[in-house]
């Protein structure tokens, strides 16, 4: 049996399948990995596209849209026997040889539980620009805001090889292209279905770190990500999920004392974000922020245990205040 399952979760993405699935099939070693498409209850012609245009691709069909988190949990549970699983977005283009560096690095480093490639924008020109969803590896700042090597807020760096020295320890790896040891994924509890989508990979990576495993970016590999394939930037639904899930992430993973203090700080920042959205006449985003805090208060009772170790304090790189750095000090790069 092949050691790797590359699982693409699809929801109403027939056009993305036509555009990107051929690159995955062409770029992925058939000796190393099976490519599996898990359809999350699509209502477009995704099933017809898969059956008629990609008849040899392994497929799983779900009866409804379970979201990114539960969709992957179900797919991984059904795709049994693989030592490694790659979570690959349906809007990712893979060049030839992308998977080998990830696999061989994990095989040579048993202390590593998950890895990611460098994530570049899928562009029409030859520029190598890091992509928002993961760039060259993710971190959390002192207030729990995610940022990346190569991307802080909306500022994206060109890849000039500045992060290529060696595979680096990171706090979180992108869910757009994440290779994880399957047994560790299950041990860590998989993706949290309550998140539905957005930031669930950060939560998973936090729990992987709590097991003592490392998460690294392997710069010898890169893939191209379109981004916004499910929910584009500026969509109030995306705003809602990002704000709500960021609060859930901190509440469920931080020790209780640190978590309470940090959530007070985040309420202040989110209040500022609410008024900024109003000032820009983005009423949908402003309402989404309010709903996010309302629903967080309803959902936080679902999480009653807190780890005894504060991982944010254990990783010095995460002590930055990127809000101050970015907006006041004008520090726009990692």
Segment roles from a protein language model:
Residues 93-133, 138-145:
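Conserved donor NDP-sugar-binding/catalytic core segment of glycosyltransferases
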Residues 137-170:
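Short, flexible, basic/aromatic active-site loop/helix in glycosyltransferases
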């Amino acid at each position: 049996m092949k050691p790797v399952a590359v699982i693409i979760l699809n929801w109403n993405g027939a056009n993305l399948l036509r555009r990107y699935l051929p690159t995955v099939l062409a770029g992925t070693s058939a000796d190393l990995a099976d490519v599996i498409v898990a359809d999350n209850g699509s209502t477009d012609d995704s099933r017809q596209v898969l059956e008629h245009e990609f008849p040899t691709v392994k497929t799983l069909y779900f009866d409804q849209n379970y979201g990114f988190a539960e969709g992957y949990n179900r797919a991984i549970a059904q795709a049994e026997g693989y030592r490694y699983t790659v979570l690959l977005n349906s809007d990712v283009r893979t060049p030839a040889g992308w998977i080998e560096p990830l696999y061989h690095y994990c095989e040579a480093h048993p202390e590593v539980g998950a890895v990611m490639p460098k994530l570049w924008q899928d562009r029409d020109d030859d520029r190598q620009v890091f992509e928002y969803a993961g760039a060259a590896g993710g971190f959390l700042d002192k207030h729990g805001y995610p940022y990346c090597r190569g991307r802080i807020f909306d500022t994206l760096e060109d890849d000039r090889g500045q992060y290529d020295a060696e595979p680096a320890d990171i706090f979180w790896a992108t869910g757009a292209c994440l290779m994880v040891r399957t047994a560790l994924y299950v041990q860590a509890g998989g993706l949290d279905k309550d998140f539905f989508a957005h930031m669930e990979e950060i939560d998973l990576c936090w729990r992987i770190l709590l097991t003592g495993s490392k998460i690294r970016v392997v710069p010898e590999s890169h893939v191209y990500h379109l981004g916004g394939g499910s929910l584009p930037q500026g969509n109030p639904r995306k705003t809602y999920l990002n704000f709500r899930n960021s609060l859930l992430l901190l509440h469920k993973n931080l020790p209780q004392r640190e978590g309470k203090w940090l959530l007070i700080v985040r309420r202040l920042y989110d209040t500022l974000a609410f008024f900024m959205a109003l000032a820009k006449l983005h009423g949908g985003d402003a309402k989404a922020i309010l709903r996010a805090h309302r629903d967080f208060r309803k959902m936080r009772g679902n999480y009653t245990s807190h780890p005894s170790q504060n991982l944010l304090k254990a990783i010095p790189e995460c002590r930055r205040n990127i809000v101050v750095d970015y907006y006041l000090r004008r520090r726009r790069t990692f």
